Amino acid sequence: MAAFTANAVDMRPPVITIHPRSKDIFSQFSLDDKLQKQYAQGIEALKEEARSMLMAAKSAKVMILIDTLERLGLGYHFEKEIEEKLEAIYKKEDGDDYDLFTTALRFRLLRQHQRRVPCSVFDKFMNKEGKFEEEPLISDVEGLLSLYDAAYLQIHGEHILQEALIFTTHHLTRIEPQLDDHSPLKLKLNRALEFPFYREIPIIYAHFYISVYERDDSRDEVLLKMAKLSYNFLQNLYKKELSQLSRWWNKLELIPNLPYIRDSVAGAYLWAVALYFEPQYSDVRMAIAKLIQIAAAVDDTYDNYATIREAQLLTEALERLNVHEIDTLPDYMKIVYRFVMSWSEDFERDATIKEQMLATPYFKAEMKKLGRAYNQELKWVMERQLPSFEEYMKNSEITSGVYIMFTVISPYLNSATQKNIDWLLSQPRLASSTAIVMRCCNDLGSNQRESKGGEVMTSLDCYMKQHGASKQETISKFKLIIEDEWKNLNEEWAATTCLPKVMVEIFRNYARIAGFCYKNNGDAYTSPKIVQQCFDALFVNPLRI
């Protein structure tokens, strides 16, 4: 601490504006068990019809059906059947005679499901100059959109897919104004141009796609009704979980004593649903939402209130995670520390009950790292030091929450094995790329808010200083970084077969929620009103059956 001036160690950081809490409409929610049972029975009755359709479908038709099921949010009902069908397509069908639409659909579905498919399948649509043949492709809107969707699963070195993205973006943008405003095709096209389908949050996209599918003259009424029933079933489950979380949060009474911390259970839970939306992951969602609230309380204590001297005390207490450390802390920090200790004990109890005790020491280790990383950020800010971009990003790998999130969910997924933990400790590219996407999206979205008055640094500030770049140049660079890291994610998604698929999914979904929440300079966690329409759709307004 000797490196800091006397004034700096006792100064409080500039407080970032915390948006007022959204109205609590969930704590008093009571699940209608009779209605939920009706939804469940309706889903089961239709599931057999849908399964029969899936098992009977062949070749191109089965791929279209799988894509429809997944877009409608129904894929989890048929995981085994979908995998069997795709494996057969992967092994037995080369697709040489497929048109553009079907070739791109096959490529995308197989890559989405962790199968390696060469991009050379698109060579047949290229001319001698290495460009896509404009005729007849530019008049095939469905084919162009299918290729556009597929191009976002590219990895490094796949120049044909980069060319596909340029080609399809140009022609789809040109064609879009010519389409009927209310046609399903235009609605899908507009959405895809705004936000690539592969990077969509599945349950949020399902709400959109159900409304689009309902307009489609070729829709299947069985699938449409099942999608609506399934969505409403999930929504009721989400309301129940949000009710439990709201009561847990209100009972803690942290806000009256710690007014500087974020008060957004709803925002935390939105993240949890985005990471794991399926009904069987209720415990996982609850753990994620609580962890986000805990991490936010600790982060805000460092960012918004603690002096350097006080922050050092908190960091040292977190290093030990022992209740006896509480007497070393200022009164307000004791509240935060009790919160951390209480949940740590709950986590340890759950891990023990589930016979996943291996997760406990690694959770504690990640919590210690998180405290050190938050403390480092505070020191940089208060001493007005701008670290190198690389140093800042390395620290951000920890503050992104990717590593601690993995350790927290592992016991709830019965995956807290030494093999899985060792994989995480090796700092795999899948985790680091996810963290970089998270940080870049975060700072692109919240740079203006956090840099108001020039008080709080972001990674953009570090990059601009180090490279002498303008803000616009830096923003452009960050967008390129995000695209590069997504290529890493796409490659690692297929390559990481040493982990259960459900564990690998957290990284892909983490990157998806980062892009969704922070697009258009928004910060959905700090200010949930930015995604209010999405929030109402997920948690408030049921679909009309």
Swiss-Prot record:
Top enzyme category: lyase
Catalytic reaction equation(s): (2E,6E)-farnesyl diphosphate = gamma-curcumene + diphosphate
Pfam families: Terpene_synth, Terpene_synth_C
GO biological-process terms attached to the record: diterpenoid biosynthetic process; farnesyl diphosphate metabolic process; sesquiterpene biosynthetic process
Coiled coil: none
Motif DDXXD motif mapped to chain: 299-303
Primary location group: cytoplasm
InterPro entries in UniProt: Isoprenoid_synthase_dom_sf, Terpene_cyclase-like_1_C, Terpene_cyclase_plant_C1, Terpene_synth_N, Terpene_synth_N_sf, Terpene_synthase-like, Terpene_synthase_metal-bd, Terpenoid_cyclase/PrenylTrfase
Binding sites annotated in the UniProt record for Mg(2+) 3: 442, 450
Named cofactor requirement(s): Mg(2+)
Keywords: Cytoplasm, Lyase, Magnesium, Metal-binding
Cofactor note: Binds 3 Mg(2+) ions per subunit.
Pathway(s) this gene product operates in, as recorded in its UniProt entry: Secondary metabolite biosynthesis; terpenoid biosynthesis
Binding site for Mg(2+) 1: 299, 303
CDD domains, alphabetized: Terpene_cyclase_plant_C1
Subcellular location: Cytoplasm, Cytosol
GO cellular component: cytosol
Positions annotated to bind Mg(2+) 2: 299, 303
GO molecular function per UniProt: gamma-curcumene synthase activity; magnesium ion binding; sesquiterpene synthase activity
Main function: Sesquiterpene synthase involved in gamma-curcumene biosynthesis.
Free-text comment about domains: The Asp-Asp-Xaa-Xaa-Asp/Glu (DDXXD/E) motif is important for the catalytic activity, presumably through binding to Mg(2+).
Record protein name field: Gamma-curcumene synthase
